[in-house]
Amino acid sequence: MRKFIIAAVLLAVLPTGNVQACVSEGPTHNKYMFSVFRRDAMDGPAYLADINQYWIDYCKGRIAADDYDRTGYTFYNNHRSEVLKVAQAKGDQAMAAYLKLLNRYIDVCDLFTVDRWSYPTKEQLATRKQKALAILNAAKAYRGTQLRQQYTLLQMRANMILGYDLANANLWNQQGKRFGKSCWREAMQNIYARTLYKSGKRLEACDQYALTNDMNSIKRVMGNYRNLAGIKSVYAQNPNSPALNYLVQDFVNNVQETLDQKPKNSDDCEWLNEIDAKCIFRNEALAFVEFAKTVAKQGKSATPCLWWTAAGMTDYLLGNQQQAMEETEQALNAAGTQRMSDNARAIRLLVTTRSARLDDAYTTYLLGEMRWLDGMIKAERSTMAYDNHYTDVKDRMVHKGLEPLFSKAGKPYMALALCDMMRQEESAYYAMAYKREEQKGYSKYQYMRHSPWDEVFCQMDSMKTDQLVGYYRFVTSTPNNALERYTVARAFKDDQYFNDLIGTKYMAEGAFAKAIPYLEKLSTEFMSNQPISIYEAQTNYDVVRWFKRQPIHYNSNEYYSPDNEYHEVTTNKKLEFCKEMMRLQSQYALTRQGQPLEELSYQLAVRYFQASCYGDCWWITHHYKSVSDSARSWELDYAKQAIEHLNLCKHSQDEQMRYRTLYALAFVHAYIPGNSWMSITYDKDWNEVMNYRPESAQYKALAELNDYATNHPERIDEYARRCDVLQRFQAMNHQP
C-alpha cells in the first residue's frame, strides 16, 4: 500500500488521453461559412506564388524545392546564392547580372529589418540611401528586353524604400501598366496601389489591390471600416467597390465569431481582438440585415447575390430561420460572381438543415448537394498550406446541421455515420498529403485509433455495446436510401477495429461470453499497433496490485515519441482474461463457503481490480485512462466487484488471507472517488492542514487494518510496516 494515494495522481503522467478532452479540446466544426474570395487571398497577393514558382521552374533539375519553399513562397530567399550559380552554369549572363542587382536590393532591405527595434544613425541612413540610389540607377540603365519587366519592378522597389512614391505612380502609368499580364506586372500594380493609398486615395487603392487578389492589403487599408458604418460609407462612395467584398464577408464572419464567443459588451471582446476579429452585437447585426436587403433591391450593386446571401447568413446565425430561408432563396437567383453564387448555394444548404423534414425529396436534394460539394472540394484543394473552404462548408453542414437533424429524427446510426464520413475524408486527405503510404514499416493499423481525442470514437465509446453492434451492422449494410448508401460507403468499417471495440466494451459490461467471439478474431499485428500495446505487453492481470505495481518501460526517453506508443504483443491477453474470468466465476458458483471459496474470491478480486480503470491492466476494459476515471453507469463497476469479493474474505479464519484482504481493502478504497480517508487544505499562511474523514470507506478500512496490525504485529510483514499511508494514519490523532 506504499504511497497509494500519490500513485493515483502519478497515473496522470502516463501517455494516455483524458475523455474530458473529447469535449473541451475537440473540434467545434464552426469554421466561417461566408466566402466570396479564396482564403489564400488573405495570405498576400497572388503574384507571390507565381514569382516563387518562376524561380522553382528556372532551377528545375538543379535545386530541389521542399514543401516550405513552395508553401511559404520562400524559394528564392532560401536559395538565392544557388540560383545565381544556376544562372551562371546555364551561361545566362543577363539573368546573372539581374540576380546580382536583386541580391543587393534584398541586402539593403535586410538592413531595415535589422533596425526594426532601434534607430539607425545619420551615417547609416545615408549609406543605405546611397546603396538604394545605386540600385535604382543600375535598374534604370538596363536596355535589354528579356528582363524588362523585372528591372522595371526593381526600379519601383527601389523607389519604394527611397520614398519616391510620385516616381512610382509615373513609372506605373508610363510603363508598368503597358506590360503584358505577368507576375512582375502584378507586383508593380501592387506597389502602385500602395502609392495611391499613401496619397489618400483609399478606395482607388483597394481597386488595385483587388486586381492583384490582395485582400490582406484591403483589410489593412480598410481597418477602420470593419463595421456597419464603414460599409455604408464605402457603399455611398462606390456601390461596386471591391472593398465591399472584403468588408461584407468580414462583417458576417465577425457576427458568427461574436456569437461563438458570447461577449456581453465591448469590454469582453479581448479574445476577438486577439484573433483580429471584431465584436458585432445583435442590434448592429439586425441593422446590417436591413441595409443588405435594401442594397440588394436598389439595383445600384452589380452583385445583389452578395447582399442577399449576407442577409441570409446573418439571419441564420441570429436564429431567424424563416427570413434566412427567404433571403438565401433570393440569393440563388441574383447576379454575382461565380464564387458568390457558390457561396449562396452553400449557405442555402446549411440553412435548410435547421428546419427540413427528412423525406425522400430532401434526402435526394442533400445527396446532390453533397456531390456538388465533393466536386468543389476537389477543384479547390491544392496544397497543405491552403485551408479548403468547401471542406469546412461540408464539415459544418454535416456536424452542425445533419447530425442533429438525423438524431432528432430517430436515426442515430446515420448521424454517427455522417460524423465518421467527415473524419474519414479528413484522414484520407492528410494521409495523402503526408504520403504516409510511402513510409516503410508503418502498419496500416496505426491509422486506427481508439483515441479519446477522436470524436467518432468518443461517441462509439459512450454507446452501450448492443447499440455499437447495431451501428456496425448499419455501416456494413447496403441501405435502400441513396444518401445512406453514399454515407456508409465513406464510413470506417474495418472488422479488426470494431471487433476490438465491441469485445472490449462487452468486457467492460462484464459480459465475457459475448466478448469472446469478437476478441477471438483479433490479430497480434492489430494489437501490436494500438497505442495501448505498450501497456498490454508489460502488465499481467494476475499480479496482486496492492502488493506490486507493474512499471512501464518506455522505448524512448522522449515522452511524446511514437516509440513510446507501440510494443509487440504476442498473445491475446484480453481473450485469455475473458476465459479465465468465466472459469473462476464458474468455480466460484459451485464452491461452498470456506477456504476454497475465499481463495477464489480473492483471485477474482485481484483480477477485477487490475482490469478496472484504476488497475495496471485498465487496457482490458478501456482504450485510454485518466486520473478522473470512474465506472460508467452502463459498465460493470470492476472496483466495486473487487471490494465485494474482498469483504467476503476479510473475516477468514486463515490469518494470512485476513491480513492480505484488510490491506487490499485499505488500498482499493484509495482509488474510489469520495472514499479517501483524508483531504489536504491550506491555512492563510499556506501551512498544510489535514482534514480527516472518519465516515469514509478508506478511513474505516485503514482503522481495521491498523487494529489488526496492533493486535497481531507478528502477522504483519515488512511491506505493510513500511507503508507510509498506514504510518501516517497510526501517527495522527484520529479521534473525531
Model-derived regions, located:
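Extracytoplasmic/secretory-pathway proteins
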Residues: 20-157, 162-736
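C-terminal segment of classical bacterial N-terminal signal peptides
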Residues: 13-19
